Each structure stands twice: as C-alpha cells, then as structure tokens.
C-alpha cells in the first residue's frame, strides 16, 4: 500500500495546502494515507473486549507492546503504541456510550479503553519521512441510536481552546463528548487522570524525546472517536502541546492533523471558527453520503475542517440497499476511499484493498461474494480448554500500564 512519494509529500498529504487539488480526483497517495490511518482506528475495534459477560469487558485484549502485531494493519512495524487511553463520563453519558461488564469484579466498571497513543518506530520514521505521533480514538460501530440518545446541552469549550477560547465569543461543544474527554475518577485505578490529560501528558513526553527530529501529530477517529479526535486536535494546537518544552521559545511546532471518518458535529460556529484560526491545525473529514450520523446534532452545530465526500452506494461490491450500519461502518468508508472517483466517474478500486474486509463486523458485501457476515470472531470467543478439561475465558493479556495512568 505504501508509495515512496508519500514520504516526500507528507506535509501536502497532511493538509499544508488544505488538500487543494487532492480531493477531486482523489489523489492516490492520499487514498493510501487515509487507509493507513483508518486501519489504525480499526485496531481499536478489533482489540476492544465487547463481551458483557467478561470481567474484562471494556478493556483492550492486548498489551500495548504487542498491539500492532495482533491486529490487522498493513505495516505493523511502523508504529509502536506507547500509552493506552481510558475514559469515563458523567452519569448522563456513561450508560449510553460506555460498556459495563455484568461481572461486579470487572476492572472497567466505570471507564472504558478508548484508544492509544503511538509513535513511529525508526523503521516507520524512515518510511514516512518524519517521526509521526498518532492518537487513535475508539468510536462505535453502532448506527444512529447512540448519537440520537445524547441529547445534552452544549458546554463551553474555553478550557480546551486556550487563548482562542478567551476572545469573548464563548465557543461551545457537545457536553457529552466533552465529558468523555475531560472526566476523571479518583476512585478508578485506570482513570485518575482524564483521557485528555493522559493524552496530553504522553504527547508532551514524546515531543521532548524527539525534539531534535522532524515530527508530526496525527489525531484520528471514527464516529464517537471522531468527535474526541476533533476536541483533542484542537486542544493540542491551542495549548501548544505540539512543541517541546526543551526547545527554546517553542520555536519548532509540529503540524497537527485530524483525520476523521463518519463524524458527528462536535461544536457550534464559534468552535468551528476558533478551530480554523489555529495556524498549526488541519482536519480532513471523510463523509459517506448515505450516512446520517454526520448530520447530528442537526441544530446549533457546525461542520469543522475540509470535507472529503464519498458515496459507497456506487460500489458494485456492496449491497445495493444497505442498512444504516453499512453506511456508517468504518471498513465501508475505507472501501469507499479505495475506489471512489466522484459522482459521475464510476467506482474502481485504485488501492487493492480486499473487499472481504467490509464484512469483518457487518453484513455489507453483496451476496454473490462467498464471505460470511461478521466473520471477525476470536477463536472460540477466547474460551480456552485447560489441562483439567474445563473451559475458561482468556480474553485479556495483562499490561504493565493497566494501572499506571500517572507515569511519565
């Protein structure tokens, strides 16, 4: 999937020119770049333990050191996960978007694993043309019900917008998304720090570590994760976390780019305007035309960033009359990015991406293709037969950082 040109063009592909001339027709290197980041988001879905009966429900299956070797990404050696992100929220939000294990002894009863921070390895930095720091936010593959349920009043975004939030306009964002981003729980072993501070602390550490290298910060997400990525990217740029504290006068500022798929609206016009004024910040928002979630909330909120509009209904590989979940499915978005040529140019896969992937977690592929629906199932649902002949659930690899949300 990689092109040598992607390394030399990375600033252009990350929005230095606001993607002018790259979207119609869709640049082939940009297609590959978007799919690479989409796979890194997909890793959060593959690794999440969603079985309510598991005491590990809401956690990540894998140790962060092994994450990219255990999930389906094209270049597992290019990035290393350095920190996992855990989020909690207030009571109005918690039960609507966070998973609670049925087991009272579960570790994630009040919070969930929401993604990770990763950094390009030496191998990856050589291939990518710089040291890329990635923040990946997990979302939800569910269709409309979750976003329609979150009917909460807006809240001030001044706290995450720094000086841009103190200009008297009082920009606002969705209270539910802000709660997930900023809530902490001193009684939780995983969430004594908010998701926000977990990420910002790790980015500051990595920016100091790689202060002598060319760096970039890429914040990615799908669905609910896209809204968190939007808040996080604005926060990083507004509060200068894209500089090293060890650099004199913060003279070196890493570009911050948000890449999001199927994103609901995050804030009002004031937030949009403040976002667009941040000089180091860019955002590319991939929207699938039949997906209704990007139109929510329908009143009082504004779209942010540059939009790449695709329409997966033109794909001959997918069901002609797909469900709402199909139009919102992340793998379907990546399929669209691989083959979209515009409304009047047909659909042809420019990037050779396996069409079987669209059935990984959904029923999207046309019946003529012999691919089972929702085929991504862990062997025996992670039940393992022990030497005594009894079956036990083994769905979680203990990680040294599980209870270490204050380090570094």
Swiss-Prot record:
Presence of keyword Lipid metabolism: yes
EC numbers on record: 3.1.1.-
Biased composition (Acidic residues): 397-408
An example Gene Ontology molecular-function term: phospholipase A1 activity
Subcellular location: Cytoplasm
Catalytic residue list: 223, 291, 328
GO cellular component: cytoplasm
SUPFAM superfamilies in the cross-refs: alpha/beta-Hydrolases
Keyword terms: Cytoplasm, Hydrolase, Lipid degradation, Lipid metabolism
Family annotation (Pfam families): Lipase_3
Stated role: Acylhydrolase that catalyzes the hydrolysis of phospholipids at the sn-1 position.
Protein name: Phospholipase A1-II 2
